[in-house]
Every structure is written in structure tokens, then in C-alpha cells.
Amino acid sequence: VNKLHVKGLDLVRSNFPKAMGELLKSVLEDILANVPKDKIDERIINFKESMKLVDFDRIAMPTGVKNMKKYSAGKNGNFTQFAKGAPAHVKAAITYNDLLEHFGVSGKYEKISNSEKIKWVYLRQNEFGLDSCGYKGYEDPTEVIDFIKQYIDHKKMYAQMLEKKIMMFYESLKWNQPVNKKTSMERFF
């Protein structure tokens, strides 16, 4: 039985989304097994297109959060303004806390605090102008989870979390970016 033992790559890190880690592992296994590039491209394109069907929790970024006060620059209405240079995951944690207040459930649910482990996602354009949102992964209010499900930005999650990692493999093999043959052929007709 051939078994792949990987160390040092994002696909095995605990702070990398599960579904994306599984894809990277299968891509790496395919590369090592000399699977043709077009088959690997197909796997990647299929994953990218099916991300909307994957449970958001499997593509959310797990991380620890700290320095929340440092990056809070006061409130503008219901939502916190962020200090320059605030990391996306810190913004996401603060946004979760703001949403607890906005939805009127801050008395029922604990806010995210420094040194907690959270998961977070990028958001598409929404009525509050929020870029990202975190959650605890347990005892989260349905209002926040529904908001995340409605506005999760799958394209940005793919671009920020996965595309660069895939391109590291591809560039080292002198391969071009994965191409969806179906849509690229349709352009000619």
C-alpha cells in the first residue's frame, strides 16, 4: 500500500480549510502519480464549480484570533470601523460580535474574544458592507450562520485560500493555470 506522508505543506496544516486540503492532497498525489495535466485541471475546475454545494464549514478558514482591541477603531452605527492593517480574520471575529448585537442576540450568545479559535469566510457585497465574518463553530446563532450562508464569497475563498497554493505546484512543473476546456471551447462557437 502506497501511502503519502506530507509535512510542511498547507494541505496538512490545521489552519487550512478541510475541503481545500483534501483537494490539494489529491492534486499532489496525482502529480506524483504522473496523472496528465488535463485530468488534474478537470479535478480543480470541478472543485471550484462545486464549492457552492460544499458545506461552508468545510471551506471556512480555521484560525486563532488575537489583538481584537488593537484593530478596532470605534463604531460607525452598528458596525466597528477597523484600524489600518487589520488582518481579515480579526475583522471577521469583530464582525461576528457586531452581528450578535445587530440581530439582538448578544445576551444569548458569547462573543468571540482574544485567543479563541474561530472559523471565518470572505463575504460578497451585502447591505452592511461587511467583507468577512467569523463564527465559533459551536453555539452560533442561526441569524449569523444564515447571513454567512447567504453571502459567502466562494470565488474569493478560492482565489485567496487555494489558487496560490495550486499555482505553486503548477509553476514548479512549468504548467499554465488550470483551464476549463468546456468553457474555453465554447468561446469559439
PLM features: what roles do these ranges have?
Residues 1-189:
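DNA-dependent DNA polymerase catalytic subunits
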